[in-house]
Amino acid sequence: MAHPPLSEFSLIDRFFARRATGPHARAALGIGDDCALLAPEPGKLLAVSTDMLVEGRHFLADVDPRALGHKTLAVNLSDLAAMGAAPRAFTLACALPRADADWLEAFSDGLFALAERHGCELIGGDTTSGPLNLCVTVFGDVACGAALRRNAARDGDDVWVSGTLGDARAGLGVIRGEWRAGEREAAAFRRALEWPQPRVALGVALAGIAHAALDVSDGLAGDLPHILERSNVRADVDVDAVPRSAALATLPADVQRRCMLEGGDDYELCFTAAPSARTAIDAAGARAGVAVTRIGTIRGLSAPTDARAVTWRDASGAPLSLTLHGFDHFHAN
């Protein structure tokens, strides 16, 4: 269907501004001025995060625009979840190679479906022409003293992860021809890659229960060490305890391990908590409808020179000799 040419401001109005406000609108001032205005709620802190998605680096050129709209916001909501913060509002800046009305309609559908599900209001942004590039800044709130931070892991804490790890990386591998999968499994992998589900309800439930947390965006092997470095501790992780999907279990063992430990784009939560919190964490996972799995233990350092690193172990506790790396934007194919 042919559409009349879109100007910058007609594009913003048609696909974004008209859908920006809804029943969850809480901004003092939203789209239409030079700035939006947000009033912090009493007793809460404002949590702010920004993520950029670039074609060819974070998503494929043939991605469904509806899925891309979803993922553009999802990866930012995942950061709020990792802090135990509830979503509140977001801004969107995008460079578009062309003003394609059908593409924009689908993209905004995916974006706003997720925004409405989590009560997150679009309050501003920017558009320009150029190679496809998307940037969201998200705002949330968390009670003072309850935020989950990377520097709060303690000696003796359990290490947990939500959901399963590795399906998104498995999907990328199938698309690239690195390995093969059955038709059903390949579809599940691609869905994990393109439709990540931010664990917002779980993150909010963990605030005040867990000690440290982050979202697994660059692979467990790349992300867990951030907690260890910031908290000045080390960790033992049972590789066999790391949760995997039934689809991932159909792939060769070495591929499973690579995807679970090194793969990115999982957007699950990795967090630590005292052993006394196990019942509360299981209950939080059940309320959020998300499986939670204990995979290891935080250990204190015996000496200041000890490595703040993960010791990967098998089910018997024996250390494994593994060379693992998380995703790095400047050292990735």
What are these regions (language model features)?
Residues R154, D158-G163, W195-L220, L224:
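Internal active-site segments that recognize and position negatively charged phosphoryl groups
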Residues A2-P23, D64, P97-E121, T128-L134, ...:
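Glycine-/charge-enriched secondary-structure boundary and capping motifs
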Residues L46, L53, A86-R176, T297:
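Glycine-rich anion-binding loops of enzyme active sites
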Residues L68-L80, G110-L111:
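Short, well-ordered amphipathic alpha-helical segments that serve as non-catalytic structural scaffolds
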Residues L37, N76, G84, L122, ...:
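Residue-level signal for inorganic ion chemistry
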Residues A181-Q197:
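A short, charged helix-loop
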